[in-house]
Amino acid sequence: MGRLRFVVLLSIFPIKTFSEPCSTMALVLRDSIKISEFINLSASEKLLPSALTAVKSVRISKVDKIISYENDTLSDIDLLKGVKLVENGYVCLAGLVVTGEWNLPDNCKGGVSICLVDKRMKRANEATLGSYHTSACKKRFTFKIIPNYSVTTADALKGIWQVMINIRGVEMEKGFCPLSLEFVSICVVYLNNIKLGLREKILNVTEGGPTELTEAVVDEFVEKVPMAARLKSFRSVNKKKPSDSSKFVNGKSRLNSRNKLNYENGDSDVGISVVDDIVVGNGVSDIRIDDDCESFDAQSDPY
């Protein structure tokens, strides 16, 4: 009788499967991005309300995507996409996870150098925050960079980060995309300068891991030129070029789309929001495409 009743209940309430919309377009495995890999918060910061601590929230940004069409590009990247900032406050860029995928057949020659840039800094060696090198035969790759420094909310809203992509040895016709990159950042938002006793602790990177923060050349295809020298040369060349006209997608300008950052005043919840967005890197300019079908809200990150 009990088994029969169980079968009847199953027939009345059919089992449904829920899937994330458009999830197949994302290269980044969101479940693998853990805040604990980048920062350690004190017990008071975990348990007390945000009004009683300097740290207001720890957040994972939305996904920003770059499609590379040229061998040398310097494109703006929104590392705080979807992060709610505190007015007149600060945000610490604790960590960055980058995932790339080569859109090439197997066993292709060549490779790429990727460099994160703070465009506020005039000296090229001070503007480079980290670099990574890999070959085209490695179809998919992931690496982490730990900038671990803070900027004001006012500076963050101006979009101060860029990514320099240097592809070498890949023989492909112009107008096609050899490489796709996705970026997700881990940020700490706070109102006042965190005291030394409360400051977040960045975990060390194990030797032999995927992170690379040096200028060392690890692949034969990479020319023996430091990324800082490449950035200085790239900037000097582009200063001589006339600025491109603004480009629009679906009636929205690229600049307006980039500045869509929200504020919060004392939000005590730790929120995680992830969404895909596409930026097409074309020389120095790029086009941003908003795709609402890939957006969703994730659950709060437990500590």
Swiss-Prot record:
Subcellular location(s): the record lists:
Host cytoplasm, Host cytoskeleton; Host cell junction, Host plasmodesma
Return the protein name: Movement protein
Q: Which classification does the entry list for the species? A: Viruses, Riboviria, Orthornavirae, Kitrinoviricota, Alsuviricetes
Q: What does the protein in this record do?
A: Transports viral genome to neighboring plant cells directly through plasmosdesmata, without any budding. The movement protein allows efficient cell to cell propagation, by bypassing the host cell wall barrier. Forms a ribonucleoprotein complex with viral RNA. Binds microtubules and modulates microtubule stability. Can bind double-stranded DNA.
Q: In the UniProt record, does the keyword Transport occur?
A: yes
Methyltransferase among keywords: no
Alphabetical GO CC annotations of the entry are: host cell cytoplasm; host cell plasmodesma; host cytoskeleton
What transmembrane ranges does the database entry give? Answer: none
Source species: Odontoglossum ringspot virus (isolate Singapore 1) (ORSV)
